[in-house]
Structure formats: structure tokens, C-alpha cells
From Swiss-Prot:
Tissues expressing this chain: Expressed strongly in heart and skeletal muscles. Weakly expressed in intestine, aorta, liver, lung, kidney, uterus and bladder.
Lineage: Eukaryota, Metazoa, Chordata, Craniata, Vertebrata
Induction pattern: Up-regulated during embryonic stem cell (ESC) differentiation into cardiomyocytes. Down-regulated by microRNA-222 (miR-222) in skeletal muscle cells, leading in inhibition of muscle-specific pre-mRNA alternative splicing events and myoblast fusion.
The keyword Nucleotide-binding appears for this protein: no
Primary location: nucleus
PANTHER family (alphabetical): GEO13361P1-RELATED, RNA-BINDING PROTEIN 24
InterPro entries: Nucleotide-bd_a/b_plait_sf, RBD_domain_sf, RNA-binding_reg, RRM_dom
Protein's job: Multifunctional RNA-binding protein involved in the regulation of pre-mRNA splicing, mRNA stability and mRNA translation important for cell fate decision and differentiation. Plays a major role in pre-mRNA alternative splicing regulation. Mediates preferentially muscle-specific exon inclusion in numerous mRNAs important for striated cardiac and skeletal muscle cell differentiation. Binds to intronic splicing enhancer (ISE) composed of stretches of GU-rich motifs localized in flanking intron of exon that will be included by alternative splicing.
Entries under SMART domains matching the protein: RRM
This protein's record includes keyword Hydrolase: no
Domain RRM: 11-88
Gene assigned in the entry: Rbm24
Disruption phenotype: Mice die in utero between embryonic days 12.5 and 14.5. Show multiple cardiac malformations, including defective endocardial cushion morphogenesis, ventricular septum defects, reduced trabeculation and compaction and dilated atria. Display loss of sarcomeres in cardiomyocytes. Show aberrant pre-mRNA alternative splicing of key genes necessary for sarcomere formation and cardiogenesis.
Name of the molecule in the record: RNA-binding protein 24
Amino acid sequence: MHTTQKDTTYTKIFVGGLPYHTTDASLRKYFEVFGDIEEAVVITDRQTGKSRGYGFVTMADRAAAERACKDPNPIIDGRKANVNLAYLGAKPRIMQPGFAFGVQQLHPALIQRPFGIPAHYVYPQAFVQPGVVIPHVQPTAAAASTTPYIDYTGAAYAQYSAAAAAAAAAAAYDQYPYAASPAAAGYVTTGGYSYAVQQPITAAAPGTAAAAAAAAAAAAAFGQYQPQQLQTDRMQ
């Protein structure tokens, strides 16, 4: 006669994490409180006969197996074990909260910004050495404070020189009170030289002999003065 094998899918329980001194009898004794037991066996090594630390318990019905698996980590023979239906496989142990290790989360403000000079501090250029990290400066502020010194070279110096020369010429011109004449308008008067003061010419009616004579006298008087040659060493 062929015996029909009973389906133990929902009644056979895997018990892991057993101490080495647990036997079939002690395993059965623990699960008897949940219902009738058909089989309780501890798996041992064939050569040494010692327990391998796990076993199987077959309950009589599915309800008893569910009651036995309600606590997934029971204490069997003084050691915490793990219990689950055999077809589901071994169930990992639940770690105690006191033994759980985690990685502490860091605040985003502590990891986003690299170490260096804070952005809200501004250091003068005279104290910053090459290679030191300099915080970002707005383009408008950088254009206004690129250097602590005033630029006296290039166009700025040429403008300053022209203004100084004009002021010096005006001061020298005030020291020599003579009437301006059309012939001397193109020449620059410099200090250190004296000129004869021209007497004012009496105005005469145009087209008369007196007017022609006055014009000839003025031409003769100004013809005696040659244009002054500027020396190169005074222009430096």
C-alpha cells in the first residue's frame, strides 16, 4: 500500500538560532503550548552528532502553526531563536534598538560650504598672499576698488599735465601787463624774459592817411621782435 504524504506547507515550521544543547524533546516541549505536534526534530551533523543550530517542528494543523509563528523571535532554551514557516525560509533576527548602528546625518550647512575664507569677510589686497582663496566680489565693486592708488599714468597723467601747463601759463601771463596784439597771439609767454610794452595806438578813421600811417608804424614796431625759440630742456 502506498501512503499519501500530508501537505505540510502551512504546518511545518523552521526554527533557527537554537543553542547546541537543544534536543528534540526540549524543542517539542516548547511548541506543545501552541497545539498538537506531529514532529519536532533538531538537525545534527552526521559525523559528530552535534546540533547544527536549527530544526523543524510540524504542527497538526495550520492554526497551531500560525500561533507558533506569531512571535518571530522566541527564547528557546535560554537563547533567542527565529521562527517562520519552512516554505518561506529562514527569517532574519530583529536587532534590538540599543544595538542598531546608524550614520549620523550632518546638517547641510556644515557640508555644502568648503573650508576657507568666509564670504562675508573682505580682506585688503595688501594682506592677501598669492594662492589664498579670495571671496567673490561683485563686478561693480571690483571696478571701483581694483587698486588703492590713483593712476597717474597714461591718459590721466596727460590730462593732469595739460591742466598744470595751462595754469602755469596763465600765472606767468598775469605777471607781465602788456596789451595783447594779434601778432603775439600764437606765441606762449614764459617767465624770465622781458618785453617792451607797446603803447596804445590812437584809433583813426578807416581809409584815411592817418590810418595807413598807423598800420605801417605798428608793422615796423612788431617786426623787430623775432619769434622766440623754445628750448628742449625746458619742455622736459
